[in-house]
């Protein structure tokens, strides 16, 4: 059996996040909107690639988003989505 057939376990550090993820995402979203970008596309591009060039320097958005690890951002997005939609799945 190849390693591609095995499920890998991903463990997230349970350290408290010193930066508020929601606050960062909202600030970055607003900065992207102000610059005329599609905020969702740009944030997804950043999350998938890790390339900060997807996020403008406008309003320090690039600096803000880089204060968080991408896995922390993704974890918060998944938690938020599931907490809002879980009842509709049951």
UniProtKB/Swiss-Prot annotation:
Belongs to the UPF0297 family. The lineage of its organism: Bacteria, Bacillati, Bacillota, Bacilli, Bacillales. Coiled coil: none annotated. This is UPF0297 protein BH1268. It comes from Halalkalibacterium halodurans (strain ATCC BAA-125 / DSM 18197 / FERM 7344 / JCM 9153 / C-125).
């Amino acid at each position: 059996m190849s390693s591609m057939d095995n499920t890998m376990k991903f463990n997230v550090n349970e350290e408290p996040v010193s930066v508020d993820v929601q606050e960062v995402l909202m600030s970055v979203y607003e900065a992207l909107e102000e610059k005329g970008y599609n905020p969702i596309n740009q944030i997804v591009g950043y999350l998938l690639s890790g390339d900060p060039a997807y996020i403008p320097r406008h309003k320090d958005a690039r600096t803000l988003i880089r204060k968080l690890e991408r896995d922390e951002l993704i974890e918060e997005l998944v938690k938020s989505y599931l907490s809002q939609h879980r009842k509709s799945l049951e």
